[in-house]
């Protein structure tokens, strides 16, 4: 399968160190050799690089590795194709507009039958099941709210929709609007939060060490999420399948386990003329999938501090 990398920080931070470890897995230390991509948020803007070449041999990847683009939210992906041809249009992450913000999505896994789920205005450019799932997810959010809701209900709804998609197979997801970084674990995902006192770390995939005490200030908070831990001498938190952690300004929110609230009709359709909140569906909006809310069992709050 593919591999994911995400970052959330409270100050603009470069991801060169973690990205150096990830791209080695794109055809050198692992077989994810069917393209790669990375997206950096700079204010409301989103700067993205994609290449269908293996990241370990990509000149574009080497440029990104050596150019310290500073961002508070980053999403990256290296691909091992299983749905859709190897091509630029099928490289993650994918980006679309919702509520006046650029939303970015990357996925690891396979989703059987997701292309039978109907879509509205959002349409895939490529042929992956991942991009179809992204379009479907954004349509459900757009159908429910005219503008971005507050953080807590948005977290619950993203988690519920991710759990519905996870019913179709393997669904590990990074999703962001540049403010929140939603990380859903279907099978494998790990994260680490770095904050003062900072220390050194060494990559698993390359003999490269960074001393974060020389690269940060005492107030910095940086969280990194990856399919597999990227460093060998730090303690990473391995997520439980079916759980989601949301990061804001580098700080992990309470981890929650999600399951879809409805079991009827996995096509993503509602009954005619109904919205998920029970009211009439707005004219011209895409259909919704599921009934109000979701069932979420809370786990203990995650501990802050250097890991």
Task: Write out the residue ranges for each language-model feature.
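Extreme N-terminus nucleophile/cap motif
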Residues: 1-59, 201, 243-246, 252-265, ...
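Conserved beta-strand-loop-short alpha-helix elements that form
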Residues: 2, 103-113
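Structured interaction and signal-relay segments at domain junctions
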Residues: 35-72, 76-81, 185-188
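Short acidic (Asp/Glu) patches
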Residues: 52-64, 78-100, 117-120
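Catalytic core of PPM/PP2C metal-dependent serine/threonine phosphatase domains
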Residues: 73, 147-187
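Glycine-rich phosphate-binding loop plus the immediately following alpha-helix
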Residues: 113-115, 119-144
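A conserved acidic, glycine/proline-rich C-terminal tail/linker
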Residues: 200-243
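Compositionally biased, low-complexity flexible segments
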Residues: 272, 277-292
